[in-house]
Swiss-Prot record:
The chain crosses the membrane at residues 15-37, 49-72, 85-106, 127-148, 178-198, 232-255, 262-284. Glycans are attached at residues 3-4, 12. One of its GO terms (molecular function) is G protein-coupled adenosine receptor activity. Residues 1-14, 73-84, 149-177, 256-261 are extracellular. The keyword Ligase does not apply. Belongs to the G-protein coupled receptor 1 family. The gene is ADORA3. It comes from Homo sapiens. Keywords: Cell membrane, Disulfide bond, G-protein coupled receptor, Glycoprotein, Lipoprotein, Membrane, Palmitate, Receptor, Transducer, Transmembrane, Transmembrane helix. A lipid is attached at residue 303 (S-palmitoyl cysteine). It is a multi-pass membrane protein. GO terms for biological process: activation of adenylate cyclase activity; G protein-coupled adenosine receptor signaling pathway; inflammatory response; negative regulation of cell migration; negative regulation of cell population proliferation; negative regulation of NF-kappaB transcription factor activity; presynaptic modulation of chemical synaptic transmission; regulation of heart contraction. Disulfide bonds join 83-166. This is Adenosine receptor A3.
Length: 318
C-alpha cells in the first residue's frame, strides 16, 4: 500500500508541475496575441477578433481551468455542487474555443465566397453578435450539468451525499460527456469546419487556376487567402489532435473500459497544452504576427518607450 501511495503522489506531483508550466505558457503566449492584435491596425479584422476570442478562452484555461484541474486531481473533499461547478468550468472554455474556431472558419469562407460583398455582410454589429453567441452557447453547454444532468440527481449513491472527494467522474455523467459535450458540440463542429476549409481550398484553387480577370492583384489576394486558410486550418488540426484523445478516453470510461491513470493524465495534459500552441502557430505562419511579436519583444528587452513601439508597428503594418 505505501508503494501505491508513493507512486500516486509522484504521479500527482509530475502532473501538477506540468499543468503549472502549460498554464504559464498559455497565459503569456495568449496575452501576447491580444497585444499584437491591439497594437497592429492591419490585424484588426473580423478573423482576428475571433482569434482574440480564442485567445481569451486559452487565457481562461491558464488562469482558471488548470488550477481547478489540479484541485480535482487531488480529490479534495468539498461540497458536491462546488466540485460540479469547477468541472463545468473545465468544459465552458473548451466549447468557447471550438465555437471561436467555427466562427473563424465561417468568416474565412465568407471572405473567399463573397469577395465583393464581404465587408457589407461582416458589419461590426454582426461580429459582436457572433462573438456573443459563441460565448453564450459555450456557457449553456458547459453549465448544463448544473441544471440536473449530473451524478447527484441521477445516481442513488450520490443522492444523499453533500460533501465528497472531488473527482471528475464523481460528479459528471459520462453520457453527457460522450453524447452531448463531445459528439454534439465538439465532433460535429469539427466535421463541419473540415468541410468548410475543404470548400475554401477548392474555391481558391479554382480562382487561381481560372484567374478570369488575369489580374495580378486578384492572384495575390487569393494567394494570401490560401496561406491564411492553411495557417488557420493548422490551428484547427492541432485542436482536434489535442482534444480527441481525451474524448476517446471518456468514451472508453463510459463503456466501462479501464484507463490507466498515466494515460488519463497524458490525455488531460495534451488537451490543456493546446492552449499554448496557437501563439506559436501564429508566430511561424502569419508574417505580420511574427513581425509584431519581434517588435514587442525587442521593445521589452531594450526598454523602448511605448510611442516608439507604436511608430515601429505602424510602419510595419503599412
Amino acid at each position: 500500500m505505501p508503494n501505491n501511495s508513493t507512486a500516486l503522489s509522484l504521479a500527482n506531483v509530475t502532473y501538477i508541475t506540468m499543468e503549472i508550466f502549460i498554464g504559464l505558457c498559455a497565459i503569456v503566449g495568449n496575452v501576447l496575441v491580444i497585444c499584437v492584435v491591439k497594437l497592429n491596425p492591419s490585424l484588426q479584422t473580423t478573423t482576428f477578433y475571433f482569434i482574440v476570442s480564442l485567445a481569451l478562452a486559452d487565457i481562461a484555461v491558464g488562469v482558471l481551468v488548470m488550477p481547478l484541474a489540479i484541485v480535482v486531481s487531488l480529490g479534495i473533499t468539498i461540497h458536491f455542487y462546488s466540485c460540479l461547478f469547477m468541472t463545468c468550468l473545465l468544459l465552458i472554455f473548451t466549447h468557447a474555443s471550438i465555437m471561436s474556431l467555427l466562427a473563424i472558419a465561417v468568416d474565412r469562407y465568407l471572405r473567399v465566397k463573397l469577395t465583393v460583398r464581404y465587408k457589407r455582410v461582416t458589419t461590426h454589429r454582426r461580429i459582436w453578435l457572433a462573438l456573443g453567441l459563441c460565448w453564450l452557447v459555450s456557457f449553456l453547454v458547459g453549465l448544463t450539468p448544473m441544471f440536473g444532468w449530473n451524478m447527484k440527481l441521477t445516481s442513488e449513491y450520490h443522492r444523499n451525499v453533500t460533501f465528497l472527494s472531488c473527482q471528475f467522474v464523481s460528479v459528471m455523467r459520462m453520457d453527457y460527456m460522450v453524447y452531448f459535450s463531445f459528439l454534439t458540440w465538439i465532433f460535429i463542429p469539427l466535421v463541419v469546419m473540415c468541410a468548410i476549409y475543404l470548400d475554401i481550398f477548392y474555391i481558391i484553387r479554382n480562382k487561381l487556376s481560372l484567374n478570369l480577370s488575369n489580374s495580378k492583384e486578384t492572384g495575390a489576394f487569393y494567394g494570401r487567402e490560401f496561406k491564411t486558410a492553411k495557417s488557420l486550418f493548422l490551428v484547427l488540426f492541432l485542436f482536434a489532435l489535442s482534444w480527441l484523445p481525451l474524448s476517446i478516453i471518456n468514451c472508453i470510461i463510459y463503456f466501462n473500459g479501464e484507463v490507466p491513470q498515466l494515460v488519463l493524465y497524458m490525455g488531460i495534459l495534451l488537451s490543456h497544452a493546446n492552449s499554448m500552441m496557437n501563439p506559436i502557430v501564429y508566430a511561424y505562419k502569419i508574417k505580420k504576427f511574427k513581425e509584431t511579436y519581434l517588435l514587442i519583444l525587442k521593445a521589452c528587452v531594450v526598454c523602448h518607450p511605448s510611442d516608439s513601439l507604436d511608430t515601429s508597428i505602424e510602419k510595419n503594418s503599412e
